[in-house]
C-alpha cells in the first residue's frame, strides 16, 4: 500500500537544492519514498512544508530535565552527581516518556548513551524494556551500554578527590559514588548479551546496540583496548565522550602527553565505527586525525552552553574535513528537546561573523539530519540517502505547519528555507513520519499514551522519594559536594589527579 503527502513547499535536500512548490511525496509499502513529483496545483487544506526528519547523535534518554533535579547552572564536574537524585523506577516508563519528547520535536534517529541505569531489574531486562519503548514510540535509537571502571568522583582515583570534600559527608559519598570495577571481558560480554536479547525480541530494527565507554578518563586502558578489539571483531559501533570541558583537556594533556586522540588511534579505537561526543576542546591537529580516520563528532551546542563547557570549534571541524552531527545531550536550550531550535542555535553560533561564511546551509543540514543516523545505526547500517527526500530514501519526514511559520506573508519571492531557519520550532510540527509510518500528529505521539505514561512516571517517582528516608539527606550531600568541588578544580584543572 502506498500513501501520499501533498505540500506547499518541499525541502528535499536543504542547502543543496532549492525549495520546490506544490509537490507530492509518495511513500511505498517498504517505508521508502517511491516518488516525488509536482502536483500541478496548490494542495487543498492548510499549507504544509515537508523536509527530512532530524537526528540527535548524542543523548542519554534522561527521564527528568536538569532544573527538575536542581542541576541547572552547574558545570559538568558537579552537575553529574545531581543525575542520581531521582530514584530508579520502571525503565519502560522512563524510556518511553523521554523518547516521546524527542520524537514530538522532530527526531527520528536518537542516540542513547545509557549512563543512567534504573536498576530495578536485571540489566538485560532493563535494556529489553528500553528497546520495547523505542518500538512502541516509533523512534530508532542507538543503545550504547555505558562502560567504565575507574574514577567515580572526578578525573582521578577517588582517594585523591575525596580529601577535598568536607569530612562529614565522605563516608556517604564513598559508599554511593565509588566505582566497583567490572573486568573488561565481562563488560564486553554484557554488550553481546544485550544485543542477542534485543534481536531475539525482534526489536533490532528499533535499537542498535553499541559499546559505550563513558570517556578516556573514566575507562582504563585495558577496558578501552578490549572495546577496540570487540568493535573490530563484531563491527559494532562505539560511542564515547571526549574533551567536553576545560578540565578534561587539562587531564588529557597531563595523562596523555603524546596526545589523547593519538592514543585512541594507537589502540585501534579511532575508526569509522566511532562517534565522539563534544570535542569542545579538541585542537586542529586532533580534528585532522579524527577526520582522517573517519570518526564522527557529535556537537552538543546547548548542552555545552548550559554546562559551561565552552563552544565547540565546529567551523574548524568542518575545515579539517570532520563528519559532524547534531546532539542535544538532554540539554536543549529551553529543556524541551526542540531539535529545530537546536539546529538554529548551532547555525547562529557557527556559521561565521559578518560576511564570513564558515558553515553552509548544506553543511548545516548534514549536521542536523544526514550524519546523525550513522551515529545511531552504525556506519555499516546507515542509509546513504538518509536526510533527503528523494526516491529510494527512507521516508523519515517532518511535516510542518507552513501557515504558522509564514504567518505574516508579504513577499512571494522569499526563500522558504530562510524562513524555516529563522522561525521554525517544535510547535510548528504537524506530523512526524518514520519509515513511512505516521508516529506523531498534531503534537501527539500515536504509538503510546504519553500523558498517561508521564503521570504514572511522576506518581511512582514521587512515591519512591517519599518512601526513602535518606533521599533528602543525599540531596543535601550532593549540594555540599558541588560546593566543595569548585575550589578543587579551580586550584588544579585536573583535580590534582594523574
Each language-model region and where it sits:
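N-terminal metal-binding scaffold of metallo-dependent hydrolase/deaminase domains
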Residues: 1-41, 49-50, 496
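Histidine-centered catalytic micro-motifs
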Residues: 52-64, 237-244
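Histidine/acidic-residue-rich catalytic or RNA/ligand-binding cores of hydrolases
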Residues: 66-69, 153-156, 246-258, 286-291, ...
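Alpha-helical scaffold segments that flank or form the walls of functional sites
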Residues: 68-140, 187-204, 458, 466
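Metal-coordinating catalytic core of metallo-dependent amide/deamination hydrolases
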Residues: 125-277
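Glycine-enriched alpha-helix->loop->beta-strand junction motifs that scaffold or abut catalytic
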Residues: 231-237, 269-272, 289-298, 319-324, ...
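His/Asp/Glu-enriched, well-ordered alpha-helical/loop segment
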Residues: 266-273, 315-404
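C-terminal cap of metal-dependent C-N hydrolases
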Residues: 394-454
Amino acid at each position: 500500500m502506498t500513501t501520499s503527502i501533498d505540500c506547499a513547499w518541499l525541502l528535499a535536500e536543504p542547502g543543496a537544492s532549492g525549495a520546490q512548490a506544490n509537490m507530492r511525496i509518495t511513500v511505498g509499502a517498504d517505508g521508502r519514498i517511491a516518488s516525488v513529483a509536482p502536483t500541478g496545483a496548490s494542495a487543498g487544506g492548510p499549507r504544509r512544508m515537508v523536509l527530512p526528519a532530524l537526528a540527535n547523535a548524542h543523548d542519554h534518554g534522561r527521564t527528568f530535565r536538569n532544573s527538575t533535579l536542581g542541576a541547572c547552572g552547574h558545570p559538568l564536574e558537579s552537575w553529574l552527581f545531581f543525575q542520581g537524585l531521582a530514584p530508579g523506577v520502571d525503565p519502560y516508563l522512563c524510556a518511553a516518556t523521554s523518547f516521546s519528547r524527542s520524537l514530538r520535536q522532530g527526531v527520528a534517529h536518537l542516540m542513547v548513551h545509557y549512563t543512567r541505569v534504573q536498576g530495578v531489574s536485571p540489566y538485560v531486562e532493563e535494556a529489553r524494556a528500553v528497546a520495547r519503548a523505542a518500538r512502541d514510540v516509533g523512534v530508532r535509537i542507538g543503545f550504547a551500554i555505558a562502560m567504565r571502571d575507574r574514577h567515580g568522583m572526578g578525573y582521578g582515583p577517588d582517594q585523591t578527590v575525596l580529601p577535598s570534600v568536607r569530612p562529614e559527608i565522605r563516608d556517604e559519598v564513598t559508599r554511593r559514588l565509588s566505582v566497583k570495577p567490572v573486568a573488561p571481558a565481562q563488560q564486553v560480554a554484557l554488550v553481546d548479551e544485550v544485543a542477542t536479547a534485543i534481536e531475539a525480541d525482534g526489536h533490532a530494527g528499533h535499537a542498535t546496540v553499541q559499546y559505550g565507554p563513558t570517556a578516556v578518563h573514566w575507562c582504563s586502558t585495558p577496558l578501552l583496548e578490549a572495546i577496540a578489539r570487540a568493535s573490530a571483531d563484531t563491527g559494532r559501533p562505539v560511542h564515547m565522550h571526549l574533551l567536553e570541558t576545560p578540565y578534561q583537556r587539562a587531564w588529557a594533556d597531563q595523562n596523555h602527553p603524546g596526545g589523547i586522540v593519538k592514543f585512541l588511534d594507537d589502540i585501534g579505537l579511532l575508526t569509522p565505527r566511532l562517534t565522539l561526543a563534544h570535542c569542545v576542546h579538541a585542537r586542529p591537529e586532533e580534528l585532522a586525525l579524527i577526520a582522517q580516520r573517519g570518526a564522527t563528532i557529535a556537537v552538543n551546542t546547548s548542552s555545552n552552553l548550559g554546562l559551561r563547557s565552552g563552544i565547540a570549534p565546529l567551523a574548524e571541524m568542518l575545515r579539517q574535513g570532520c563528519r559532524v552531527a547534531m546532539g542535544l545531550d538532554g540539554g536543549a536550550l529551553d529543556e524541551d528537546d526542540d531539535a529545530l531550535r537546536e539546529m538554529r542555535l548551532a547555525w547562529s553560533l557557527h556559521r561565521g561573523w559578518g560576511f564570513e561564511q564558515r558553515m553552509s546551509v548544506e553543511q548545516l543540514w548534514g549536521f542536523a539530519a544526514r550524519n546523525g543516523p550513522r551515529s545511531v545505526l552504525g556506519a555499516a547500517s546507515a542509509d546513504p540517502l538518509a536526510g533527503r527526500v528523494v526516491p529510494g530514501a527512507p521516508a523519515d519526514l517532518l511535516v510542518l505547519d507552513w501557515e504558522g511559520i509564514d504567518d505574516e506573508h508579504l513577499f512571494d519571492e522569499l526563500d522558504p528555507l530562510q524562513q524555516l531557519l529563522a522561525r521554525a520550532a517544535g510547535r510548528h510540527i504537524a506530523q512526524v513520519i518514520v519509515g513511512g509510518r505516521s508516529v506523531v500528529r498534531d503534537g501527539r505521539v500515536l504509538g503510546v499514551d504519553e500523558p498517561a505514561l508521564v503521570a504514572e512516571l511522576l506518581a511512582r517517582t514521587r512515591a519512591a522519594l517519599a518512601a526513602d528516608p535518606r533521599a533528602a539527606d543525599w540531596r543535601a550531600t550532593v549540594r555540599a559536594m558541588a560546593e566543595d568541588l569548585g575550589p578543587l578544580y579551580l586550584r588544579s584543572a585536573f583535580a590534582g589527579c594523574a
